[in-house]
C-alpha cells in the first residue's frame, strides 16, 4: 500500500497515522515480536490502542530487509527502505521473501476467484527497482501509470499504539482532479475529540504487482478511462487461508468482490462496506469535508461497484470530522454545509457539484437508518425541493426531508445533476405531493371553513348536504378562547341504524380545539401535537387524519349552497325557522315578573334591577336560539354552566322599551331580555335580562328569531 490514512473510524483510537515522508519509501512495521525493539510501532489483531498516530522508528536490521512477525495474528507486512542505500545481500533476501509472499497471496486469491490473473514473482517486479532520484522524477513525470483505488480495511478489535511523532506526509492526496480515482482519501488533520470508535479505514494505493508505490503529491491529473473495481481488504481479525498469517487478500476482480458476502465467515466477521452512491449516507457525511476537490470531475462509473452495509456505514461515519475527499463525481453528493456532530468546528463551505437534489438529514447523522417524515407547520415538504431520488441498493434512498425543530441537522442540502430523477417513493404522509394542500392554499380558503360567529346548529345546517370530510371551525360557545370543529363523517355502515326522517345531523361530529400558550390542540387526543395556528392544524389534518375520524377536505367554495354565513332572517320568517342564531351577551339577572309578559315584563325587570343598591356583576354567556328553544352557556362558569329554556316555555323576547343601557364593568350597552315560564312556580313568569357584549354580535338576530318561532303555530 502506498498510504496508510488517518481515520476517525477506528475503534478506541483517534486516527491511524502514517510515517512521515522524510524518506520517500517508508511503511509500517508488522505486528510486534520479542525480536523487535520496544519502541517499534505495530498493528495487532486485538484492537486499536488509545493513540492512533504511528511514527516510524529506525530499523535495527539491514535497510532493505523485511522484518517478519512471528505471531500468527500479524496480518500486515511492510517494507522499510532507507533513501540512497541498497545492500545487495539484503536485496536478495527481500526479493526471495517477496516472491514467497506473492506465491502465498496468489494461492489465496485463486481459492476465492479462479479467474484471477496471477501476479508473476521475480526480481523484475517494482520492488526490485532502485530508489534513485531519477526514478522518482520519472514517476512524477508519468502519473498516468498510476491506477489509484480505494481500499477498505475493517477491524473491530484493532489497536494502534503510540508513536513519538505524528504523521505529516504531504503525499496523502492523490493527483488532483484525476478521473481515474475511485476511492476516498481521509485527512489526518483530525482533532482527537472528533474520532469515532467504528471499524472502517480507507486509504488509497496504486495498482501494482507486488509493492505499492506512493502517489507523488505533485503528480499531474491523468486522463485515462475509469479505473477497475475497488480493492477490499477484510478485517484484521479475520481468519486467513494462507501461510504466514496473510489474511488480507487483494480483490481485483468483480466476481471476487461480489463473493465477499458469501465468503464472509472465512474472510471477515464484520466487513465495513461503504457506499459512494449519491443517495447514501456516506456522501452526506463526506460532503462536510474541509476541502472539496475540483467540481468538474468526470463521472463514468456507477455507484453499484461499492458494497453497502447499513449496519456499518452509519456507525462508522457518524462522528466524522473535517476530512479530505476525493471521489468520483457520479458517486458523490456534496452538501454545501453540514455539521455532522456536536462539538466539532463547522466545516468550510464547499462549492456544490450541481444544483438539484432533495434536502434531507442523512440517516448516519441522525443515528437512524430511515428518515422519519415529519410534516412542517404547513404539512408539506420544503418548497423547491424535488421528489426523492432512488438508486439501486438496499440503502440508497432519500426522502424529501421536512425540516423541523426536532431534527438536529442544521443544513444538509445536497446537489446532484448526474442522476436522473426517479418517481417519488411512497411515504406515510398520505397522498402525493401535488395532491397535498399547501399552507398558502389553506389560508386562502379560510373564509370558507372558518366561521367564528355561527352557532352549532348553523354549522350542522351548512354541513348537512356536504361530502364526508367537510368541516367548519367556529368559536366555542362553551369554552372561551377555544374553537369548535364540526366535521361530516362517513356514512353509517348499516342503513338500519338510521331512523325514519333522519336529516343526517348525527353524521356531523363536534370536536373541541383547545388554545393555550403551546398552541392549538385537539382536546382528548394526547397523541396529537400542538400546532401554531388553526391553519396549521387544518393543513396537517387534511394530510393525515391523526385522531379525527377522517381527513379534512379543504373547501374551495361556500358550504351549504353558497351563503352559509348569511343572516338567518334575510329571507323572512321561513328562512328563520330553518336556521339558528346565537351571540355572546352579558347576563345580568333574572327577575320574577309574576304574570306579566311581553314588553311590560322586560321594562319592569330592568327597572327593578337598576334600582338595586348593589348592581349585579355581569357574566359573559353564549346566547343561542334554535328550534328547540334558548340555551344559555356560562363561558366563565361563574353563575351556572348551562341552562336550557324550551320553546314551549317562552313568552316574549325583546329590547328595553325605554332604550336604557348597561354601563357597569363595560361600555354602554343596550339591554334586552326574554320572558319564560318559571321552572318552580307554574303561575309565574321570570324575565332574564342581558346586555349586548359585542357590537359585531348584536342581539337583534336572536330577538327576531325568537319572535318568528313564537309566531309559528305549529311549534307552539
Curated annotation (Swiss-Prot):
**GO CC annotations on file:** cytoskeleton; cytosol; focal adhesion
Q: Which GO terms describe its molecular function?
A: actin binding
The biased composition feature labelled Pro residues covers 214-228
Signal peptide residues on this chain, from the entry's feature table: 1-17
Record flagged with keyword Signal: yes
Q: Name one Pfam family in it.
A: PTB
Taking every annotated instance into account, which residue ranges of this chain make up the domain PTB?
A: 583-704
GO terms (BP aspect): protein localization
- Report the SMART domains cross-referenced here: PTB, SH2
Where is this protein primarily located?
A: other
**Could you tell me where the Basic and acidic residues compositional bias lies?**
138-150
In this protein, which residues make up the domain named SH2?
Answer: 449-556
Specify residue ranges for compositional bias: Polar residues: 197-206, 265-274, 402-419
- Please indicate if the UniProt record lists Cytoplasm as a keyword: yes
UniProt xrefs under Gene3D superfamilies: Pleckstrin-homology domain (PH domain)/Phosphotyrosine-binding domain (PTB), SH2 domain
Q: Where in the cell is it found?
A: Cell junction, Focal adhesion; Cytoplasm, Cytoskeleton
Keywords assigned: Actin-binding, Cell junction, Cytoplasm, Cytoskeleton, Phosphoprotein, SH2 domain, Signal
Which residues does the annotated region (Disordered) include? 119-274, 301-322, 334-366, 379-436
Q: Which InterPro entries match?
A: PH-like_dom_sf, PTB, PTB/PI_dom, SH2, SH2_dom_sf, Tensin_PTB, Tensin_PTEN_phosphatase
Q: Which residues carry this modification: Phosphoserine?
A: 248
Function according to Swiss-Prot or TrEMBL = Promotes EGF-induced cell migration by displacing tensin TNS3 from the cytoplasmic tail of integrin ITGB1 which results in dissociation of TNS3 from focal adhesions, disassembly of actin stress fibers and initiation of cell migration. Suppresses ligand-induced degradation of EGFR by reducing EGFR ubiquitination in the presence of EGF. Increases MET protein stability by inhibiting MET endocytosis and subsequent lysosomal degradation which leads to increased cell survival, proliferation and migration.
Q: Which family does it belong to?
A: Belongs to the PTEN phosphatase protein family.
Quaternary form?
Answer: Interacts (via SH2 domain) with Rho GTPase-activating protein DLC1 (via C-terminus); the interaction is independent of DLC1 tyrosine phosphorylation. Interacts with integrin ITGB1; the interaction displaces tensin TNS3 from the ITGB1 cytoplasmic tail and promotes ITGB1 stability. Interacts (via SH2 domain) with E3 ubiquitin-protein ligase CBL (phosphorylated on 'Tyr-782'); the interaction is enhanced in the presence of EGF and reduces interaction of CBL with EGFR.
Q: Per its record, how is this protein called by name?
A: Tensin-4
Task: State the species of origin.
Answer: Bos taurus (Bovine)
